[in-house]
């Protein structure tokens, strides 16, 4: 795509929301991932339910789902989307890294990549917020789109 082909700009080169009126509705799915690194003790306390603010993973899961649904309110040019599925899962390395994965699905005229990315980002920020009293050095890293399907551009899979 050439610079002149960018669709978020009008004839005056000012920002606009892309017109998706004539696009066909298709099933669209996106998976995103982010990793938060923390002290070993922090991860152990999360799993043991010993964080003063409550069940960290349950709250982060709900925050991620809510974020997917609110993406168009946070990112100016994102279309409001009827989200038909939003799921958040967690996997850790048993030491210091917790990986957050989101899956977002819709049937619509535009994709859900931004919703999936927003979901993992907000879930990671929620974990940071709930654990910062004991571990201010946590790092949120490697937030990326893993896969997207549907729509005119077809399937995308990140390189492993």
UniProtKB/Swiss-Prot annotation:
One of its GO terms (molecular function) is cyclic pyranopterin monophosphate synthase activity. It catalyses: (8S)-3',8-cyclo-7,8-dihydroguanosine 5'-triphosphate = cyclic pyranopterin phosphate + diphosphate. GO terms for biological process: Mo-molybdopterin cofactor biosynthetic process. The keyword Endoplasmic reticulum does not apply. Disulfide bonds: none annotated. Its EC number is 4.6.1.17. It comes from the Bacteria. Gene3D superfamilies: Molybdopterin cofactor biosynthesis C (MoaC) domain. InterPro entries: MoaC, MoaC_bact/euk, MoaC_sf, MoCo_biosynth_MoaA/MoaC, Mopterin_CF_biosynth-C_dom. The active site is at 129. PANTHER family: CYCLIC PYRANOPTERIN MONOPHOSPHATE SYNTHASE, MOLYBDOPTERIN COFACTOR SYNTHESIS PROTEIN A. Belongs to the MoaC family. Homohexamer; trimer of dimers. This is Cyclic pyranopterin monophosphate synthase. It comes from Listeria monocytogenes serotype 4b (strain CLIP80459).
